[in-house]
Amino acid sequence: MCQNIFQKIIKGIIPSKIIYQDKEITAFHDINPIAPIHILVVPNLLIKSLNEINENNKHILGNMLYISIKIAKKFKIDKNGYRLIINCNQHGRQEIQHLHLHLLGGKKLNKI
């Protein structure tokens, strides 16, 4: 079975700066950061996009958000603020077909 880059990072096949991992969620530094702090929070289970969330796996979104808050506090960006982004499919500019959340912070971010 062909694995995407996130699956390889989750399984330790590709080295990465993993900052959090449990049985459901893995978080690691983005290799092409667009902010001083740019962390990807991904489910360990392959969910290709936000559109694949359903009754059976919807709890994963809550876990992704909760872990993001914990990471923001760990990196001390919770007070000044941070941004969470989920891109969905081609027009949403999702590049890897594995649901992931971008945690951005460490400076005042541009308006969107």
UniProtKB/Swiss-Prot annotation:
Matches recorded under InterPro entries: Histidine_triad_CS (IPR019808), Histidine_triad_HIT (IPR001310), HIT-like (IPR011146), HIT-like_sf (IPR036265)
GO molecular function terms listed in the Swiss-Prot or TrEMBL record: catalytic activity
Domain of life assignment: Bacteria
The HIT domain, residue ranges: 5-112
Motif Histidine triad motif: chain residues: 98-102
Pfam families: HIT
UniProt-listed PROSITE patterns: HIT_1 (PS00892), HIT_2 (PS51084)
Gene3D superfamilies: HIT-like
Protein name per Swiss-Prot or TrEMBL: Uncharacterized HIT-like protein bbp_327
